[in-house]
């Protein structure tokens, strides 16, 4: 098992993994979707996704440990079946899709959601999104998570309007993405995306996982709710622009 040794790969992969860890803690949620596009500067998108798989699972476990009492059980029970459905769709269509197409769709959707939130801010007493919207967005999250580890923007578009506290938001997302990422292992292996070289490279990057999550957890537990969601929006903005750029470049 010989990992990647090219220093240019690690010059990009190290900050990408740290950014992913900070995002997994809940602080700056949405920034994590930049990890695969960043690593795609030095390796292919499928290889970047495969390398990040074990790292993501460790980060999810750390997030669950940090927020194990802070999650919405009823919301999670609603989200998980739809997210898993998205993985099934992603598995069946993976070889038919160009990653650029998916990146473009997610990028446009993310920017439209942000524009709607900024131009028409929700009222404090406004009704939450209907459940059919949640089902559609969560299935989309499972799909985009499978093909590009970019599941954050779609599910954020549903969960953010629910106005959860930062801690409950973070805990719920940690549990959701742990199940989603765990469910991706078998399809990834079936599609031939996992190999010993990628797994060895994952082991090299693994020590960065707790560092990124630790930084994000400390910030998330101390930040004001309004400021927290501003960082979420900023992360989604950068993600949307980068994904759209990847689609047209």
Name every feature range the model reports, one short phrase each:
Residues 71-118:
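Glycine/small-residue-rich loop that forms an oxyanion/phosphate-binding "nest" at active or ligand-binding sites
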Residues 60-70, 105-130, 217-218, 238-249:
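Transmembrane helix exit motif
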Residues 37, 91-95, 157, 217:
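Small-residue-mediated transmembrane helix hinge/kink sites in multi-pass secondary transporters
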Residues 48, 89, 93-94, 99, ...:
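Hydrophobic alpha-helical transmembrane segments in multi-pass integral membrane proteins
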Residues 56, 83-87, 110, 177, ...:
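Residue-level recognition of pore/gate-forming positions within transmembrane alpha-helices
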Residues 72-83, 104-107, 128-138, 168-174, ...:
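Cytoplasmic-side transmembrane-helix entry/capping segments in multi-pass membrane proteins
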Residues 214-237:
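Interfacial loop-to-transmembrane junctions
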Residues 9-77, 137-142, 152-213:
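Small-residue-rich hydrophobic segments that form or flank transmembrane alpha-helices
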